[in-house]
């Protein structure tokens, strides 16, 4: 871990340089491939890891090799992972989904912004230097129309987004021919339905049933379609965002690009400092993944941070502002009801959710019901007009393992289930947020409660952290819980960085959190038995046994760290072909010994076989030629 401390000016300059010099970049020995769909503009990006051949025999002068298949893997990096694409952050990404949105002919461009706050910001000349220049003209559903993927799914329509997702979720595994790579252990899916091949129709069915969501605001056409549901690959979210005391627009854009490079399936912008509106615009226009927000944070900024001064009108204006910018999902803390707040009084750590504490304070100061709950149907109407998915927030999640699975937590969860059914009346897509801090033996109940009371809507959890004793290592404590709940059926895991409980994460913290959570998600996919999940593991194991070091580095989730740690002790190029590593050395390497045992066994088999043939030859009289009936 670097101990160099940069000044704020240096941090901003470094981030600006990153943005100015940004190019599409492939991982080592990987190439970007595109798998096409039924129409020419459905081109699904994947990363294909190229592997070296295996030495199978021959001589030093004439070695014989066997080719190893390239391994295709899911890729969230968008254009940033394609060396052939010219990147210009000032212009934003190509509008991949715009033709699909336009072809449906159920939305229209607005003459003006619906949000008074947006109009005010656009009229402020003092913000010109901060503002993204290529602003989109926002769209909204035509009168009487709903533009959500749930609406289309319920009406039997398979959208291009659904076909894109089906191809993406299959991860190119149909390209793999090797039986060694295709081998997979049966999983234990806890009732999840995992088909051998994911079809566009299966995607439609899952969305129509509410078991999966496709976060895809019509005003975020730059995003590449993805799906969140327990019958699909487990997804990972990364949080970024500035605060009142640190970070800048350029640093947040840098973190966005960095997060997608390291596997973030979605990104939440949790900015609470200055220029929230402008920061979000830059992020959206440059994001290939769905963007989520917590609108109450910005609404609070609009009333100078005084929770008691929040109003439905200010919050509604914020929803319109963000929906027309292109936010793909809102976290809404509508389940924090007035009658639940006293339940938290006997907790060790009270209410730890920022959104939950804001709404609890508002309810108590006015002695009124949560205005998000009271106006929930109006929230749904707004979401239906732009296809903003709802992430129903767990404002009463436990902030310590002592408070896990208590009355307040599950009371709110049951209310979120009631709100889910209301949202579905408006064809609004919904996922449910979950904890938090939960010891291992209490995790599964969270999943079963959610499935039962929230009608199988996708679950999205923060960890959970399984112990409270490891500040600085909470990406580990939560990664354990994340792997478990992902196995039990959680659809998306919100990453936790090493800075959790300590400070705002920087670029390196984002990477560490994502790698930890990609491990957790992948472990869950293996345990569930997701088809094709084991291919990369098998390829790695084969490369490891055959001492193909370069392939081991390249197959790793983090090739750079794998290579660096190997080279700390064996930096020479000869170390990349050595049949040992520095852990055991050349004489005690278990895999080298195993290979020798295997070679010896094979030689013994040949020798025994030759002896048997010799004995058989002598038994038949030692004649070179035999009569036909004797053969």
UniProtKB/Swiss-Prot annotation:
Transmembrane segments: none
Reactions that this protein is recorded to catalyse: 5-amino-1-(5-phospho-beta-D-ribosyl)imidazole + S-adenosyl-L-methionine = 4-amino-2-methyl-5-(phosphooxymethyl)pyrimidine + CO + 5'-deoxyadenosine + formate + L-methionine + 3 H(+)
Subunit relationships: Homodimer.
Top-level enzyme category: lyase
Binding site for [4Fe-4S] cluster: 581, 584, 589
Cofactor(s), names only, from the UniProt record: [4Fe-4S] cluster
Protein's job: Catalyzes the synthesis of the hydroxymethylpyrimidine phosphate (HMP-P) moiety of thiamine from aminoimidazole ribotide (AIR) in a radical S-adenosyl-L-methionine (SAM)-dependent reaction.
Binding annotation for substrate: 239, 268, 297, 333, 353-355, 394-397, 433, 460
Protein name according to UniProt: Phosphomethylpyrimidine synthase
GO MF annotations in UniProt: 4 iron, 4 sulfur cluster binding; carbon-carbon lyase activity; zinc ion binding
Biological processes annotated in GO: thiamine biosynthetic process; thiamine diphosphate biosynthetic process
Keywords per UniProt: 4Fe-4S, Iron, Iron-sulfur, Lyase, Metal-binding, S-adenosyl-L-methionine, Thiamine biosynthesis, Zinc
Stated family: Belongs to the ThiC family.
Pathway field: Cofactor biosynthesis; thiamine diphosphate biosynthesis
Cellular component per GO, a single term: cytosol
InterPro entries: ThiC, ThiC-associated_dom, ThiC/Bza_core_dom, ThiC/BzaA/B
Pfam family, one: ThiC-associated
EC number(s) given by UniProt: 4.1.99.17
Cofactor annotation remark: Binds 1 [4Fe-4S] cluster per subunit. The cluster is coordinated with 3 cysteines and an exchangeable S-adenosyl-L-methionine.
Residues that hold Zn(2+) according to the record: 437, 501
